[in-house]
Amino acid sequence: MRTYIAVLGLAIAASSALVARAADEPIDAETKARIERFEKGPATIDISKYPDGIKENYEVFSTKCSQCHKLSRPINSDYAVPEDWSRYIKRMMRKPGSGISAGDGKKIFDFLAYDSSVRKKKILDEKLAKATPEEKKAAEDKIKELHDKYDK
């Protein structure tokens, strides 16, 4: 776990040096259509049955992520595999003014990856069926690690 946090921290630090897409830079039509589709869905999740730690992480997610876009975007996205969320969060952290620290990024990741393993099970299973054996094992290990950490 410490190794994962250290690697995530290094990746975040390295990625922050990259130049983020300018806010006014146009988005291609396909990406714009995907975003619009995701934003049409619900903007909240019933987390009442989630573990307390995940509920706390949801609060960080909802506070930080709603500053720049609708929560319906990540909630209804087709991201489900932990690696998808890792890339997404790193990209959001690079955005100027995001205010997402490495610690917040980890909490947001934990929430989104955990939530996907519960609420997006069908999408997750479909993606894992198409993954390489190594990718599938890495995703399953990360999901197990999250459930071991939070399901008490």
Residues covered by each model-derived region:
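Positively charged n-region of N-terminal signal peptides that target proteins for export
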Residues: M1-I5
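Flexible coil segments in periplasmic/lumen-exposed cytochrome c-class electron-transfer proteins
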Residues: D24-I54, S62, A102-K152
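Detector for the c-type heme attachment site
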Residues: C68-P74, S101, A113
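Bacterial N-terminal signal peptides
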Residues: V7-S16
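C-type cytochrome heme c attachment motif
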Residues: E59-L71, D84-K90, R94-K95, K106-D110
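Short cysteine/histidine-rich zinc-coordinating motifs and their immediately flanking basic loops
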Residues: S77-P82
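Sec/Tat signal peptide C-region and signal peptidase I cleavage site
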Residues: S16-A22
